[in-house]
Protein backbone atom coordinates (compact mmCIF):
# COMPACT_ATOMS: atom_id res chain seq x y z
CA UNK A 1 0.00 0.00 0.00
CA UNK A 2 1.35 3.43 -0.97
CA UNK A 3 1.25 6.19 1.63
CA UNK A 4 1.51 9.82 0.61
CA UNK A 5 2.69 12.42 3.07
CA UNK A 6 3.62 16.10 3.07
CA UNK A 7 6.84 17.25 4.76
CA UNK A 8 6.72 19.90 7.46
CA UNK A 9 7.73 23.52 6.82
CA UNK A 10 11.35 24.54 7.09
CA UNK A 11 12.49 25.66 10.50
CA UNK A 12 12.94 24.33 13.94
CA UNK A 13 11.02 21.24 14.92
CA UNK A 14 9.77 23.16 17.96
CA UNK A 15 7.38 25.07 15.68
CA UNK A 16 5.50 21.88 14.81
CA UNK A 17 1.77 22.11 15.60
CA UNK A 18 -0.09 19.46 17.51
CA UNK A 19 -2.87 19.56 14.89
CA UNK A 20 -0.37 18.46 12.22
CA UNK A 21 0.61 15.48 14.31
CA UNK A 22 -3.02 14.41 14.60
CA UNK A 23 -3.87 15.30 11.00
CA UNK A 24 -1.78 12.58 9.39
CA UNK A 25 -2.89 9.67 11.62
CA UNK A 26 0.63 8.39 12.09
CA UNK A 27 3.70 8.54 14.20
CA UNK A 28 7.13 10.17 13.80
CA UNK A 29 10.31 8.25 13.93
CA UNK A 30 13.16 10.06 15.66
CA UNK A 31 16.13 8.26 17.11
CA UNK A 32 14.86 4.69 16.93
CA UNK A 33 11.64 5.59 18.90
CA UNK A 34 8.34 4.52 17.37
CA UNK A 35 5.17 6.40 18.48
CA UNK A 36 1.83 5.16 17.30
CA UNK A 37 -1.14 7.48 17.08
CA UNK A 38 -4.19 5.50 18.19
CA UNK A 39 -7.83 6.65 18.03
CA UNK A 40 -10.41 5.72 20.69
CA UNK A 41 -13.99 4.71 20.11
CA UNK A 42 -16.94 5.11 22.53
CA UNK A 43 -15.81 2.04 24.51
CA UNK A 44 -12.19 3.28 24.92
CA UNK A 45 -10.62 0.37 23.00
CA UNK A 46 -7.48 1.09 20.97
CA UNK A 47 -6.84 0.18 17.34
CA UNK A 48 -3.41 -0.18 15.83
CA UNK A 49 -3.03 2.10 12.85
CA UNK A 50 -2.42 0.39 9.53
CA UNK A 51 -1.55 3.58 7.69
CA UNK A 52 1.61 5.11 9.17
CA UNK A 53 3.41 8.28 8.19
CA UNK A 54 7.10 9.02 8.84
CA UNK A 55 7.98 12.61 9.64
CA UNK A 56 11.54 13.23 8.45
CA UNK A 57 13.60 16.40 8.81
CA UNK A 58 12.89 19.15 6.30
CA UNK A 59 14.99 18.56 3.16
CA UNK A 60 12.99 20.75 0.80
CA UNK A 61 9.80 20.23 -1.15
CA UNK A 62 10.65 16.77 -2.36
CA UNK A 63 8.11 13.95 -2.38
CA UNK A 64 9.09 10.40 -1.55
CA UNK A 65 7.48 7.12 -2.42
CA UNK A 66 7.68 4.82 0.59
CA UNK A 67 6.91 1.13 0.24
CA UNK A 68 4.11 -0.32 2.34
CA UNK A 69 4.95 -1.37 5.83
CA UNK A 70 3.85 -4.74 7.04
CA UNK A 71 2.45 -5.01 10.57
CA UNK A 72 4.55 -6.71 13.24
CA UNK A 73 4.04 -10.44 13.65
CA UNK A 74 1.79 -11.73 16.32
CA UNK A 75 3.59 -12.31 19.57
CA UNK A 76 3.32 -15.48 21.53
CA UNK A 77 0.78 -15.12 24.35
CA UNK A 78 3.05 -17.15 26.61
CA UNK A 79 5.73 -14.41 26.49
CA UNK A 80 3.38 -11.80 27.99
CA UNK A 81 3.32 -9.75 24.71
CA UNK A 82 6.34 -7.50 25.41
CA UNK A 83 6.68 -6.35 21.76
CA UNK A 84 3.15 -5.07 21.58
CA UNK A 85 3.35 -3.14 24.85
CA UNK A 86 6.50 -1.23 23.86
CA UNK A 87 4.83 1.25 21.47
CA UNK A 88 2.18 2.15 24.03
CA UNK A 89 4.70 2.62 26.80
CA UNK A 90 6.70 4.92 24.57
CA UNK A 91 3.87 7.47 24.56
CA UNK A 92 5.00 8.89 27.89
CA UNK A 93 8.63 9.35 26.68
CA UNK A 94 9.63 12.69 25.18
CA UNK A 95 10.28 12.82 21.44
CA UNK A 96 13.91 13.66 20.48
CA UNK A 97 14.30 16.26 17.76
CA UNK A 98 17.07 18.19 16.05
CA UNK A 99 18.59 20.34 18.70
CA UNK A 100 15.54 20.51 21.04
CA UNK A 101 12.79 18.36 22.54
CA UNK A 102 9.02 18.89 22.83
CA UNK A 103 6.22 16.87 24.41
CA UNK A 104 2.98 16.68 22.42
CA UNK A 105 -0.26 17.08 24.37
CA UNK A 106 -2.58 14.27 23.46
CA UNK A 107 -6.31 14.42 24.18
CA UNK A 108 -7.66 12.13 26.88
CA UNK A 109 -8.27 8.58 25.79
CA UNK A 110 -11.86 8.72 27.08
CA UNK A 111 -12.82 11.33 24.47
CA UNK A 112 -15.21 10.02 21.78
CA UNK A 113 -14.44 11.53 18.40
CA UNK A 114 -17.34 11.37 15.92
CA UNK A 115 -17.27 11.16 12.16
CA UNK A 116 -13.63 10.02 12.22
CA UNK A 117 -12.59 7.25 9.86
CA UNK A 118 -10.20 4.63 11.18
CA UNK A 119 -8.47 1.85 9.32
CA UNK A 120 -9.51 -1.63 10.33
CA UNK A 121 -7.01 -3.88 8.56
CA UNK A 122 -5.48 -5.00 11.82
CA UNK A 123 -8.68 -4.89 13.89
CA UNK A 124 -9.78 -8.38 12.94
CA UNK A 125 -6.56 -9.90 14.24
CA UNK A 126 -7.35 -11.43 17.61
CA UNK A 127 -3.87 -10.95 19.01
CA UNK A 128 -3.74 -7.22 18.39
CA UNK A 129 -7.24 -6.68 19.70
CA UNK A 130 -6.53 -8.70 22.80
CA UNK A 131 -3.24 -6.90 23.44
CA UNK A 132 -4.77 -3.46 22.97
CA UNK A 133 -7.68 -4.34 25.26
CA UNK A 134 -5.32 -5.62 27.97
CA UNK A 135 -2.94 -2.70 27.75
CA UNK A 136 -5.61 -0.01 27.95
CA UNK A 137 -5.74 -0.02 31.76
CA UNK A 138 -1.93 0.33 31.97
CA UNK A 139 -1.46 3.13 29.47
CA UNK A 140 -4.66 4.99 30.37
CA UNK A 141 -3.24 6.44 33.59
CA UNK A 142 -0.20 7.82 31.75
CA UNK A 143 -2.11 9.39 28.87
CA UNK A 144 -4.81 10.93 31.10
CA UNK A 145 -2.13 13.01 32.86
CA UNK A 146 -1.82 15.28 29.84
CA UNK A 147 -3.96 18.41 30.21
CA UNK A 148 -6.27 18.94 27.26
CA UNK A 149 -6.79 22.17 25.38
CA UNK A 150 -10.24 22.76 23.81
CA UNK A 151 -8.82 24.66 20.85
CA UNK A 152 -6.35 21.87 20.05
CA UNK A 153 -9.06 19.23 20.35
CA UNK A 154 -11.35 21.04 17.96
CA UNK A 155 -8.50 21.68 15.53
CA UNK A 156 -7.50 18.02 15.55
CA UNK A 157 -11.12 17.00 14.89
CA UNK A 158 -11.29 19.34 11.90
CA UNK A 159 -8.01 17.99 10.46
CA UNK A 160 -9.11 14.41 10.90
CA UNK A 161 -12.47 14.96 9.22
CA UNK A 162 -10.78 16.80 6.33
CA UNK A 163 -8.35 13.94 5.89
CA UNK A 164 -11.17 11.43 5.85
CA UNK A 165 -13.13 13.43 3.28
CA UNK A 166 -10.13 14.06 0.99
CA UNK A 167 -9.77 10.31 0.47
CA UNK A 168 -6.43 9.71 2.19
CA UNK A 169 -7.84 6.51 3.64
CA UNK A 170 -9.67 3.94 1.52
CA UNK A 171 -13.41 3.85 2.14
CA UNK A 172 -13.52 0.06 2.31
CA UNK A 173 -11.38 0.00 5.45
CA UNK A 174 -13.11 2.80 7.41
CA UNK A 175 -15.61 2.77 10.25
CA UNK A 176 -17.53 5.69 11.77
CA UNK A 177 -18.12 6.61 15.38
CA UNK A 178 -21.43 7.92 16.66
CA UNK A 179 -21.67 11.72 16.50
CA UNK A 180 -23.86 12.16 19.55
CA UNK A 181 -21.15 10.57 21.70
CA UNK A 182 -18.65 13.28 20.79
CA UNK A 183 -21.16 16.07 21.40
CA UNK A 184 -21.89 14.72 24.87
CA UNK A 185 -18.22 14.15 25.68
CA UNK A 186 -17.04 17.48 24.23
CA UNK A 187 -19.75 19.38 26.06
CA UNK A 188 -18.76 17.83 29.36
CA UNK A 189 -14.97 17.95 28.81
CA UNK A 190 -14.94 21.56 27.63
CA UNK A 191 -17.07 22.54 30.59
CA UNK A 192 -14.45 21.18 32.98
CA UNK A 193 -16.27 18.02 34.07
CA UNK A 194 -14.35 14.74 34.07
CA UNK A 195 -16.35 11.79 32.80
CA UNK A 196 -15.64 8.33 34.24
CA UNK A 197 -13.60 6.02 32.01
CA UNK A 198 -15.48 3.14 30.55
CA UNK A 199 -14.24 -0.40 30.41
CA UNK A 200 -13.08 -1.84 27.07
CA UNK A 201 -15.64 -3.86 25.17
CA UNK A 202 -14.95 -7.28 23.62
CA UNK A 203 -13.80 -7.49 19.97
CA UNK A 204 -17.22 -8.72 18.85
CA UNK A 205 -18.76 -5.31 19.64
CA UNK A 206 -16.51 -3.43 17.18
CA UNK A 207 -18.99 -2.37 14.54
CA UNK A 208 -20.37 0.71 12.89
CA UNK A 209 -23.16 0.97 15.49
CA UNK A 210 -22.51 2.82 18.77
CA UNK A 211 -21.55 0.77 21.80
CA UNK A 212 -23.90 0.42 24.81
CA UNK A 213 -21.40 2.20 27.06
CA UNK A 214 -21.72 5.39 25.00
CA UNK A 215 -25.52 5.28 25.26
CA UNK A 216 -25.19 4.83 29.04
CA UNK A 217 -22.93 7.91 29.17
CA UNK A 218 -25.48 9.88 27.19
CA UNK A 219 -28.29 8.84 29.53
CA UNK A 220 -26.18 9.78 32.57
CA UNK A 221 -25.46 13.19 31.07
CA UNK A 222 -29.13 13.76 30.26
CA UNK A 223 -30.16 12.73 33.78
CA UNK A 224 -27.56 15.07 35.30
CA UNK A 225 -28.76 17.98 33.16
CA UNK A 226 -32.38 17.26 34.08
CA UNK A 227 -31.53 17.09 37.79
CA UNK A 228 -29.74 20.47 37.56
CA UNK A 229 -32.71 21.99 35.72
CA UNK A 230 -35.14 20.63 38.32
CA UNK A 231 -33.01 21.98 41.18
CA UNK A 232 -32.96 25.42 39.56
CA UNK A 233 -36.69 25.34 38.86
CA UNK A 234 -37.58 24.18 42.39
CA UNK A 235 -36.88 27.50 44.25
CA UNK A 236 -38.54 29.48 41.46
CA UNK A 237 -41.71 27.39 41.67
CA UNK A 238 -41.77 27.65 45.47
CA UNK A 239 -42.06 31.44 45.36
CA UNK A 240 -45.60 32.15 44.26
CA UNK A 241 -46.65 35.76 43.81
CA UNK A 242 -49.25 36.82 46.31
CA UNK A 243 -52.42 38.00 44.65
CA UNK A 244 -53.84 41.12 46.32
CA UNK A 245 -57.28 40.62 47.76
CA UNK A 246 -59.88 42.92 46.28
CA UNK A 247 -62.29 44.52 48.72
CA UNK A 248 -65.92 44.19 47.82
CA UNK A 249 -67.77 47.43 47.34
CA UNK A 250 -70.66 47.87 49.72
CA UNK A 251 -74.08 48.41 48.26
CA UNK A 252 -75.51 51.80 49.32
CA UNK A 253 -78.97 50.23 49.52
CA UNK A 254 -77.82 47.69 52.10
CA UNK A 255 -79.12 48.51 55.60
CA UNK A 256 -76.59 49.55 58.21
CA UNK A 257 -76.02 47.53 61.34
CA UNK A 258 -77.36 48.95 64.62
CA UNK A 259 -75.11 50.47 67.25
CA UNK A 260 -74.66 49.12 70.77
CA UNK A 261 -76.07 50.73 73.90
CA UNK A 262 -72.70 52.08 74.96
CA UNK A 263 -72.24 53.69 71.53
CA UNK A 264 -75.59 55.44 71.89
CA UNK A 265 -74.60 56.69 75.32
CA UNK A 266 -71.26 57.82 73.92
CA UNK A 267 -73.00 59.82 71.19
CA UNK A 268 -75.26 61.50 73.70
CA UNK A 269 -72.52 62.45 76.16
CA UNK A 270 -69.64 63.22 73.80
CA UNK A 271 -70.90 66.67 72.82
CA UNK A 272 -71.43 67.71 76.43
CA UNK A 273 -67.94 66.57 77.44
CA UNK A 274 -66.41 68.34 74.43
CA UNK A 275 -68.28 71.51 75.36
CA UNK A 276 -66.91 71.40 78.89
CA UNK A 277 -63.37 70.34 77.85
CA UNK A 278 -62.70 71.54 74.27
CA UNK A 279 -58.99 70.60 74.45
CA UNK A 280 -59.65 67.02 75.55
CA UNK A 281 -58.45 64.24 73.25
CA UNK A 282 -60.52 61.32 72.08
CA UNK A 283 -58.87 58.98 74.56
CA UNK A 284 -59.65 61.26 77.48
CA UNK A 285 -63.23 61.67 76.30
CA UNK A 286 -63.63 57.91 75.97
CA UNK A 287 -62.28 57.40 79.50
CA UNK A 288 -64.72 59.93 80.90
CA UNK A 289 -67.61 58.32 79.02
CA UNK A 290 -66.59 54.86 80.25
CA UNK A 291 -66.53 56.07 83.86
CA UNK A 292 -69.92 57.69 83.40
CA UNK A 293 -71.32 54.50 81.85
CA UNK A 294 -70.07 52.48 84.80
CA UNK A 295 -71.65 54.92 87.22
CA UNK A 296 -75.05 54.68 85.51
CA UNK A 297 -77.82 52.66 87.08
CA UNK A 298 -79.43 49.61 85.61
CA UNK A 299 -82.61 51.47 84.72
CA UNK A 300 -80.75 54.07 82.66
CA UNK A 301 -78.74 51.38 80.93
CA UNK A 302 -81.91 49.48 80.15
CA UNK A 303 -83.23 52.51 78.26
CA UNK A 304 -80.28 52.41 75.86
CA UNK A 305 -80.47 48.64 75.61
CA UNK A 306 -84.11 48.82 74.60
CA UNK A 307 -83.23 51.30 71.89
CA UNK A 308 -80.56 48.96 70.54
CA UNK A 309 -82.96 46.00 70.57
CA UNK A 310 -85.54 47.98 68.63
CA UNK A 311 -82.87 49.06 66.14
CA UNK A 312 -81.79 45.42 65.76
CA UNK A 313 -85.32 44.33 64.99
CA UNK A 314 -85.70 47.02 62.36
CA UNK A 315 -82.32 46.10 60.91
CA UNK A 316 -83.31 42.44 60.60
CA UNK A 317 -86.52 43.39 58.84
CA UNK A 318 -84.72 45.70 56.43
CA UNK A 319 -82.06 43.06 55.79
CA UNK A 320 -84.68 40.43 54.95
CA UNK A 321 -86.36 42.82 52.53
CA UNK A 322 -83.00 43.71 50.97
CA UNK A 323 -82.08 40.07 50.46
CA UNK A 324 -85.48 39.30 48.98
CA UNK A 325 -85.04 42.15 46.52
CA UNK A 326 -81.62 40.82 45.55
CA UNK A 327 -83.04 37.35 44.97
CA UNK A 328 -85.86 38.73 42.87
CA UNK A 329 -83.44 40.80 40.80
CA UNK A 330 -81.16 37.82 40.19
CA UNK A 331 -84.10 35.64 39.22
CA UNK A 332 -85.40 38.30 36.85
CA UNK A 333 -81.97 38.69 35.22
CA UNK A 334 -81.57 34.92 34.81
CA UNK A 335 -85.07 34.67 33.36
CA UNK A 336 -84.30 37.43 30.88
CA UNK A 337 -81.05 35.74 29.87
CA UNK A 338 -82.80 32.40 29.38
CA UNK A 339 -85.57 34.00 27.35
CA UNK A 340 -83.00 35.68 25.12
CA UNK A 341 -81.19 32.37 24.64
CA UNK A 342 -84.41 30.53 23.89
CA UNK A 343 -85.43 33.18 21.35
CA UNK A 344 -82.03 32.93 19.67
CA UNK A 345 -82.25 29.14 19.57
CA UNK A 346 -85.74 29.23 18.12
CA UNK A 347 -84.67 31.71 15.47
CA UNK A 348 -81.68 29.56 14.55
CA UNK A 349 -83.82 26.42 14.45
CA UNK A 350 -86.44 28.10 12.27
CA UNK A 351 -83.75 29.25 9.87
CA UNK A 352 -82.37 25.72 9.68
CA UNK A 353 -85.78 24.19 9.10
CA UNK A 354 -86.65 26.69 6.38
CA UNK A 355 -83.35 26.06 4.62
CA UNK A 356 -83.78 22.28 4.86
CA UNK A 357 -87.37 22.41 3.63
CA UNK A 358 -86.33 24.55 0.70
CA UNK A 359 -83.30 22.52 -0.31
CA UNK A 360 -84.46 18.89 0.10
CA UNK A 361 -87.70 18.88 -1.96
CA UNK A 362 -86.28 21.03 -4.74
CA UNK A 363 -83.40 18.60 -5.15
CA UNK A 364 -85.91 15.78 -5.73
CA UNK A 365 -87.68 17.58 -8.60
CA UNK A 366 -85.51 17.85 -11.66
CA UNK A 367 -87.81 20.03 -13.75
CA UNK A 368 -88.08 22.86 -11.25
CA UNK A 369 -84.38 22.96 -10.34
CA UNK A 370 -83.23 22.48 -13.93
CA UNK A 371 -84.03 25.97 -15.14
CA UNK A 372 -83.38 28.48 -12.33
CA UNK A 373 -81.45 30.82 -14.62
CA UNK A 374 -84.23 30.90 -17.22
CA UNK A 375 -86.76 31.69 -14.52
CA UNK A 376 -84.59 34.50 -13.16
CA UNK A 377 -84.09 35.93 -16.64
CA UNK A 378 -87.74 35.63 -17.74
CA UNK A 379 -89.52 36.62 -14.52
CA UNK A 380 -89.34 40.26 -13.39
CA UNK A 381 -88.35 41.40 -9.91
CA UNK A 382 -91.94 41.39 -8.70
CA UNK A 383 -91.68 37.66 -8.03
CA UNK A 384 -91.30 36.86 -4.34
CA UNK A 385 -87.67 35.98 -3.46
CA UNK A 386 -88.58 33.22 -0.98
CA UNK A 387 -91.33 30.65 -1.62
CA UNK A 388 -93.95 30.04 1.02
CA UNK A 389 -93.59 26.61 2.59
CA UNK A 390 -96.64 24.80 3.91
CA UNK A 391 -96.58 21.50 5.74
CA UNK A 392 -98.92 19.23 3.80
CA UNK A 393 -99.65 15.57 4.59
CA UNK A 394 -98.04 14.56 1.29
CA UNK A 395 -94.81 16.49 2.03
CA UNK A 396 -95.51 18.79 -0.89
CA UNK A 397 -94.33 22.36 -1.26
CA UNK A 398 -96.70 25.05 -2.47
CA UNK A 399 -94.82 27.87 -4.10
CA UNK A 400 -96.47 31.22 -4.64
CA UNK A 401 -95.44 32.89 -7.88
CA UNK A 402 -96.75 36.33 -8.75
CA UNK A 403 -96.88 37.01 -12.48
CA UNK A 404 -96.52 40.60 -13.52
CA UNK A 405 -98.86 42.28 -15.99
CA UNK A 406 -96.08 42.98 -18.47
CA UNK A 407 -94.94 39.37 -18.48
CA UNK A 408 -95.43 37.62 -21.86
CA UNK A 409 -98.31 35.17 -21.93
CA UNK A 410 -96.34 32.44 -23.65
CA UNK A 411 -94.07 32.06 -20.60
CA UNK A 412 -96.59 31.99 -17.75
CA UNK A 413 -98.82 29.10 -18.87
CA UNK A 414 -96.03 26.59 -19.63
CA UNK A 415 -94.30 27.53 -16.41
CA UNK A 416 -97.41 26.94 -14.27
CA UNK A 417 -98.29 23.75 -16.11
CA UNK A 418 -94.77 22.39 -15.75
CA UNK A 419 -94.76 23.22 -12.06
CA UNK A 420 -98.16 21.56 -11.59
CA UNK A 421 -97.12 18.41 -13.41
CA UNK A 422 -93.89 18.17 -11.47
CA UNK A 423 -95.70 18.62 -8.18
CA UNK A 424 -98.35 16.04 -9.05
CA UNK A 425 -95.76 13.62 -10.35
CA UNK A 426 -93.56 14.04 -7.30
CA UNK A 427 -96.37 13.34 -4.82
CA UNK A 428 -96.16 9.52 -4.97
CA UNK A 429 -92.38 9.70 -4.98
CA UNK A 430 -92.44 11.64 -1.75
CA UNK A 431 -94.84 9.09 -0.31
CA UNK A 432 -92.57 6.24 -1.30
CA UNK A 433 -89.26 7.82 -0.21
CA UNK A 434 -89.88 10.49 2.48
CA UNK A 435 -86.96 12.55 3.82
CA UNK A 436 -86.21 10.90 7.13
CA UNK A 437 -83.67 13.49 8.17
CA UNK A 438 -86.12 16.38 7.89
CA UNK A 439 -88.70 14.48 9.93
CA UNK A 440 -86.16 13.71 12.62
CA UNK A 441 -85.04 17.30 12.64
CA UNK A 442 -88.62 18.50 12.94
CA UNK A 443 -89.24 16.11 15.80
CA UNK A 444 -86.14 17.37 17.57
CA UNK A 445 -87.23 20.95 17.04
CA UNK A 446 -90.66 20.21 18.42
CA UNK A 447 -89.14 18.55 21.45
CA UNK A 448 -86.84 21.51 21.98
CA UNK A 449 -89.74 23.92 21.70
CA UNK A 450 -91.73 21.89 24.21
CA UNK A 451 -88.79 21.85 26.59
CA UNK A 452 -88.35 25.59 26.18
CA UNK A 453 -92.03 26.16 26.85
CA UNK A 454 -91.82 24.02 29.96
CA UNK A 455 -88.76 25.93 31.11
CA UNK A 456 -90.54 29.21 30.48
CA UNK A 457 -93.53 28.04 32.47
CA UNK A 458 -91.30 26.93 35.32
CA UNK A 459 -89.51 30.26 35.28
CA UNK A 460 -92.81 32.12 35.30
CA UNK A 461 -94.00 30.03 38.23
CA UNK A 462 -90.78 30.74 40.09
CA UNK A 463 -91.13 34.44 39.38
CA UNK A 464 -94.72 34.38 40.61
CA UNK A 465 -93.66 32.57 43.76
CA UNK A 466 -90.87 35.03 44.38
CA UNK A 467 -93.25 37.93 43.76
CA UNK A 468 -95.72 36.45 46.21
CA UNK A 469 -92.98 35.94 48.76
CA UNK A 470 -91.90 39.53 48.30
CA UNK A 471 -95.46 40.75 48.73
CA UNK A 472 -95.88 38.64 51.84
CA UNK A 473 -92.69 40.05 53.29
CA UNK A 474 -93.85 43.58 52.55
CA UNK A 475 -97.23 42.88 54.12
CA UNK A 476 -95.59 41.45 57.20
CA UNK A 477 -93.35 44.47 57.45
CA UNK A 478 -96.32 46.80 57.06
CA UNK A 479 -98.27 44.90 59.69
CA UNK A 480 -95.37 44.98 62.08
CA UNK A 481 -94.90 48.68 61.46
CA UNK A 482 -98.61 49.30 61.98
CA UNK A 483 -98.59 47.26 65.17
CA UNK A 484 -95.58 49.15 66.42
CA UNK A 485 -97.27 52.44 65.61
CA UNK A 486 -100.45 51.33 67.35
CA UNK A 487 -98.53 50.27 70.41
CA UNK A 488 -96.84 53.63 70.57
CA UNK A 489 -100.20 55.36 70.18
CA UNK A 490 -101.73 53.25 72.93
CA UNK A 491 -98.82 53.97 75.20
CA UNK A 492 -99.23 57.67 74.60
CA UNK A 493 -102.97 57.46 75.35
CA UNK A 494 -102.29 55.54 78.54
CA UNK A 495 -99.74 58.11 79.59
CA UNK A 496 -102.23 60.88 78.87
CA UNK A 497 -104.91 59.14 80.92
CA UNK A 498 -102.52 58.67 83.78
CA UNK A 499 -101.66 62.34 83.65
CA UNK A 500 -105.33 63.27 83.71
CA UNK A 501 -105.90 60.97 86.67
CA UNK A 502 -102.95 62.51 88.43
CA UNK A 503 -104.30 65.99 87.75
CA UNK A 504 -107.70 65.02 89.12
CA UNK A 505 -106.08 63.61 92.20
CA UNK A 506 -104.14 66.83 92.63
CA UNK A 507 -107.30 68.87 92.26
CA UNK A 508 -109.04 66.73 94.84
CA UNK A 509 -106.15 67.15 97.21
CA UNK A 510 -106.21 70.90 96.67
CA UNK A 511 -109.92 71.02 97.32
CA UNK A 512 -109.49 69.02 100.48
CA UNK A 513 -106.78 71.37 101.62
CA UNK A 514 -108.98 74.35 100.90
CA UNK A 515 -111.82 72.86 102.84
CA UNK A 516 -109.54 72.17 105.76
CA UNK A 517 -108.24 75.72 105.65
CA UNK A 518 -111.77 77.05 105.59
CA UNK A 519 -112.74 74.92 108.54
CA UNK A 520 -109.71 76.03 110.47
CA UNK A 521 -110.42 79.64 109.67
CA UNK A 522 -114.01 79.28 110.71
CA UNK A 523 -112.98 77.62 113.94
CA UNK A 524 -110.50 80.40 114.59
CA UNK A 525 -113.16 83.01 114.09
CA UNK A 526 -115.69 81.13 116.16
CA UNK A 527 -113.55 81.30 119.29
CA UNK A 528 -115.33 83.20 122.25
CA UNK A 529 -114.63 86.95 122.46
CA UNK A 530 -114.56 88.94 125.86
CA UNK A 531 -117.89 89.13 127.61
CA UNK A 532 -119.44 92.53 127.00
CA UNK A 533 -122.99 91.25 127.12
CA UNK A 534 -124.57 88.11 128.16
CA UNK A 535 -123.05 84.90 126.95
CA UNK A 536 -126.16 83.87 125.16
CA UNK A 537 -126.37 87.05 123.22
CA UNK A 538 -122.72 86.87 122.45
CA UNK A 539 -123.09 83.34 121.26
CA UNK A 540 -126.03 84.30 119.12
CA UNK A 541 -124.75 87.54 117.74
CA UNK A 542 -121.02 86.81 117.43
CA UNK A 543 -121.21 84.02 114.93
CA UNK A 544 -123.27 86.02 112.53
CA UNK A 545 -120.57 88.49 111.57
CA UNK A 546 -117.96 85.81 111.85
CA UNK A 547 -119.78 83.66 109.42
CA UNK A 548 -120.73 86.47 107.15
CA UNK A 549 -117.42 88.30 107.09
CA UNK A 550 -115.01 85.58 105.74
CA UNK A 551 -117.24 84.54 102.88
CA UNK A 552 -115.95 86.93 100.23
CA UNK A 553 -112.30 86.25 101.10
CA UNK A 554 -112.76 82.48 100.91
CA UNK A 555 -114.58 82.74 97.61
CA UNK A 556 -111.79 84.81 96.12
CA UNK A 557 -109.19 82.38 97.37
CA UNK A 558 -111.04 79.42 95.84
CA UNK A 559 -111.40 81.17 92.50
CA UNK A 560 -107.66 81.91 92.42
CA UNK A 561 -106.79 78.29 93.21
CA UNK A 562 -109.13 76.98 90.52
CA UNK A 563 -107.66 79.34 87.90
CA UNK A 564 -104.13 78.23 88.82
CA UNK A 565 -105.03 74.54 88.55
CA UNK A 566 -106.71 75.09 85.19
CA UNK A 567 -103.63 76.88 83.82
CA UNK A 568 -101.38 74.07 85.07
CA UNK A 569 -103.59 71.42 83.46
CA UNK A 570 -103.70 73.30 80.17
CA UNK A 571 -99.90 73.72 80.14
CA UNK A 572 -99.37 70.03 80.81
CA UNK A 573 -101.84 69.03 78.09
CA UNK A 574 -100.14 71.32 75.60
CA UNK A 575 -96.76 69.79 76.45
CA UNK A 576 -98.02 66.24 75.88
UniProtKB/Swiss-Prot annotation:
Gene3D superfamilies: High mobility group box domain (1.10.30.10). CDD domains: HMG-box_TOX-like. Residues 255-323 bind DNA. SMART domains: HMG (SM00398). Keywords: Activator, Apoptosis, DNA-binding, Nucleus, Transcription, Transcription regulation. PROSITE patterns: HMG_BOX_2 (PS50118). Residues 240-250 have a biased composition (Basic residues). It is found in: Nucleus. GO terms for cellular component: cytosol; nucleoplasm; nucleus. Induction: Up-regulated by GPR39 in neuronal cells. InterPro entries: HMG_box_dom (IPR009071), HMG_box_dom_sf (IPR036910), TOX_HMG-box_domain (IPR051365). The keyword DNA-binding applies. GO terms for molecular function: chromatin binding; chromatin DNA binding; phosphoprotein binding; protein homodimerization activity; transcription coactivator activity. Residues 528-542 have a biased composition (Polar residues). Expressed mainly in epithelial cells. Expressed in the central nervous system (CNS), in the ileum and within the brain in the frontal and occipital lobe. Homodimer. Interacts with CREB1; the interaction is not depolarization dependent. Interacts with CREBBP (via C-terminus). Interacts (via HGM box) with CITED1 (via C-terminus); the interaction increases estrogen-response element (ERE)-dependent transcription and protection against cell death. Interacts with CREB1 (phosphorylated form). Transcriptional coactivator of the p300/CBP-mediated transcription complex. Activates transactivation through cAMP response element (CRE) sites. Protects against cell death by inducing antiapoptotic and repressing pro-apoptotic transcripts. Stimulates transcription from the estrogen-responsive or BCL-2 promoters. Required for depolarization-induced transcription activation of the C-FOS promoter in neurons. Associates with chromatin to the estrogen-responsive C3 promoter region. This is TOX high mobility group box family member 3. The gene is TOX3.
Amino acid sequence: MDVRFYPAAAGDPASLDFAQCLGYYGYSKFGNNNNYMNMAEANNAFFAASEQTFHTPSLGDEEFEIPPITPPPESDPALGMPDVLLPFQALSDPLPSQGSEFTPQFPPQSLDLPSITISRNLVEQDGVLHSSGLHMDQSHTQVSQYRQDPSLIMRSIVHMTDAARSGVMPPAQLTTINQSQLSAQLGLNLGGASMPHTSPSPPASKSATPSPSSSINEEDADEANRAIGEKRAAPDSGKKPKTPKKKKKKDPNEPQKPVSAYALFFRDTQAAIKGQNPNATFGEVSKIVASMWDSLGEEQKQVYKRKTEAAKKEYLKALAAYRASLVSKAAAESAEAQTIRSVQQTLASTNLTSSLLLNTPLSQHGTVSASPQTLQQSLPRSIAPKPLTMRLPMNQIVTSVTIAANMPSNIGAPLISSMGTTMVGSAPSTQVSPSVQTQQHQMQLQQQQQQQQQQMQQMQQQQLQQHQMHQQIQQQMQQQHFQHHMQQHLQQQQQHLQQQINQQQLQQQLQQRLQLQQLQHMQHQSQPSPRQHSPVASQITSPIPAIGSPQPASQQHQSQIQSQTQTQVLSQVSIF
